[in-house]
């Protein structure tokens, strides 16, 4: 769901996991070229991903995503381009509604075909994005740089080096009430402007991936990464609230340093004549966070950093050994099974201690066994069916532990990890040049972590007892001829509380807020290698509950987009001129909801009809 709020990053939900996140990614794990884009505590973001360098994206849903460890209700693997011969330079410029610009450059190439010792491939890109924003007080700018370098060390080993850096400055327009949205979806609440709600993010990260074939049947893989992330956020919390005893102020200043290593060994063999592959490994991640809070005012001047109200150092680490196996039981029947033992430790040291704000230091440690298994049967060469089951584990993030409800001071150490059990039945069928998929699933969760309340940009969390998700997914990706492609997907997801999450009132049987019951997409594209191309897509989302009581809902919507362009191939040059219209019929709809917003400002409106045009020019040195 697109919040249209660059201060809070993109929200992604997989089978309802991630829907509670008020900023960034939550409940799912994301990897870019094998390096986590999810912090060790489970909080992720997409701001450091260069969309112009993406080669493909794979999404893993269902029980086996749990084998990736903590916060893996789903897994998204992003693979960026690998440089190839010939060397290519590319420049692109894009302009859209609301004063939006994106300019980028990219260079890629290789010194060989990657099979000989000393062969090198590279992809380097940089981009700048600026926008005034659809709503008032929603301007943003982002500078992004990425580099990927691959080296063939010898006949049996390769090394990939990765680097990225991002700087984001964004105003935060916050949410609106239903009346405000209907009167003027572009407006903001008065406090947002008074306190100049905004966020600044600086992140730098580097990683390496070493792969070696130890023998005909053995492979070694080592992934290492390290990074730092600095975040400063000014919230629109009223002055009187910030002055309460124990309240941590209206400015959040975070400094995070994180690193990790994942080492795995893969062995292929036969056991009792059954071909089997074993993969064993150890994953270690750690993060140190310095969290400070300040008043968002200085005297009568609002929207500036004032007196300190919080100062703590948080340390978390996780250590996860794991084993995965793949058994080819017969020509048609295969079994995948694995287990992971996840240990997550959290420790907080409070350095801001006063008579009215006592020492809130504390620690927590969580352990869980995470088994998963899947049985796959090949009905024929183009059709298979499978059944799978597994257990998932999701600990609170540092942010979720940082705030308690009802203006209480200190850490939310009563927040417990959520555990889930998932079963799934599905099938995949190749139809000509297309793929038809179907899946039914059920996920039962205990101690699900959900939003308790949200106030002026600050959210506290609670455990919701038991929840259940039942769903059906259908998908079709069909190629017609050489240039036509049709994609369609539909998800029916019934996500409900099974025990009380509303305090004195009963929420048993209520829908979990933030999750749509029906989601559908269809897209048709005509895309030859050169000349004219065009496409259209339709998205539907049913209504979404915005609070635990289900008293408030964001209405359903259907939006249509169209795009077209022309691509020239002239000797070594490629020119691509393109344009797009989103929300073609100018629907007034809600792009995202802020769950349990205490002031009734649940709604984050989406833009009306908007336009974009662009040009990409590349030159290949042949």
Q: What residue ranges belong to the model's regions?
A:
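Membrane-embedded beta-barrel scaffold of Gram-negative outer-membrane proteins
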Residues: 115, 209-213, 219-237, 378, ...
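Surface-exposed extracellular loop regions of Gram-negative outer-membrane beta-barrel proteins
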Residues: 169-187, 288-295, 301, 345-354, ...
């Amino acid at each position: 769901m697109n919040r249209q709020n660059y201060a809070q990053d993109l929200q992604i939900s997989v089978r309802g996991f991630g829907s509670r996140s008020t900023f960034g990614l939550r409940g799912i794990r994301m990897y870019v070229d094998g390096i986590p884009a999810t912090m060790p505590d489970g909080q992720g973001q997409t701001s450091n991903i260069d969309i112009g360098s993406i080669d493909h994206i794979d999404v893993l849903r269902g029980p086996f995503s749990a084998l990736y460890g903590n916060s893996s209700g789903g897994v998204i693997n992003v693979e960026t381009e690998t440089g190839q011969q010939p060397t290519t330079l590319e420049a692109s410029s894009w302009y859209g509604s609301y004063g939006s610009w994106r300019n980028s450059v990219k260079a890629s190439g290789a010194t060989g075909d990657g099979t000989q010792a000393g062969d090198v491939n590279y992809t380097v890109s940089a981009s700048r994005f600026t926008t005034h924003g659809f709503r008032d007080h929603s301007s943003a700018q982002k500078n992004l740089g990425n580099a990927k370098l691959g080296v063939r060390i010898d006949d049996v080993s390769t090394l990939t080096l990765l680097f990225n850096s991002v700087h984001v400055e964004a105003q935060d327009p916050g949410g609106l009430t239903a009346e405000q949205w209907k009167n003027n979806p572009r407006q903001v609440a008065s406090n947002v402007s008074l306190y100049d709600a905004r966020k600044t993010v600086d992140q730098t990260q580097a990683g390496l991936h070493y792969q070696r074939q130890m023998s005909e049947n053995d492979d070694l893989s080592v992934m290492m990464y390290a990074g730092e992330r600095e975040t400063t956020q000014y919230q629109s919390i009223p002055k009187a609230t910030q002055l309460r005893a124990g309240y941590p102020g209206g400015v959040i200043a975070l400094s995070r340093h994180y690193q990790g290593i994942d080492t795995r060994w893969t062995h292929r063999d036969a056991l009792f004549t059954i071909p089997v592959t074993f993969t064993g490994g150890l994953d270690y991640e750690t993060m140190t966070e310095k969290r400070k809070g300040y008043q968002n005012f200085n005297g009568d001047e609002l929207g500036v950093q004032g007196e300190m109200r919080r100062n703590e150092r948080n340390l978390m680490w996780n250590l996860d050994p794991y084993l995965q196996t793949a058994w080819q039981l017969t020509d048609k029947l295969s079994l995948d099974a694995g287990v992971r033992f996840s240990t997550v430790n959290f420790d907080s040291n409070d350095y801001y201690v006063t008579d009215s704000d006592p020492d809130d230091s504390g620690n927590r440690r969580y352990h869980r066994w995470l088994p998963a298994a899947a049985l796959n049967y090949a009905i024929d060469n183009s059709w298979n069916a499978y059944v799978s089951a597994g257990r998932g584990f999701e600990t609170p993030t540092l942010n979720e532990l940082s705030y308690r409800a009802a203006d209480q001071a200190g850490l939310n150490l009563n927040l417990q990890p959520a555990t889930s059990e998932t079963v799934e039945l599905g099938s995949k069928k190749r139809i000509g040049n297309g793929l038809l998929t179907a899946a039914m699933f059920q996920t039962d969760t205990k101690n699900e972590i959900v939003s308790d309340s949200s106030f002026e940009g600050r959210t506290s969390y609670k455990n919701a007892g038991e929840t259940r998700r039942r769903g059906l997914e259908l998908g079709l990706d069909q190629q017609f001829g050489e240039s036509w492609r049709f994609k369609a997907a539909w998800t029916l997801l019934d996500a409900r509380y099974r025990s009380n999450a509303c305090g004195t009132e009963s929420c048993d049987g209520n829908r979990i807020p933030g999750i749509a019951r029906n989601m559908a997409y269809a897209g048709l594209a005509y895309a030859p290698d050169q000349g004219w191309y065009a496409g259209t897509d339709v998205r539907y989302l049913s209504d979404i509950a915005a609070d635990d009581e289900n008293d408030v809902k964001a209405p359903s919507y259907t939006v249509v987009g169209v795009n077209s362009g022309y691509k020239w191939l002239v000797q070594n040059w490629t020119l691509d001129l393109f344009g797009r219209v989103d929300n073609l019929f100018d629907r007034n709809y809600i792009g995202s909801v802020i769950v349990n917003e205490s002031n009734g400002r649940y709604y984050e409106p989406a833009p009306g009809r908007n336009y974009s045009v662009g040009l990409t020019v590349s030159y290949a040195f042949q």
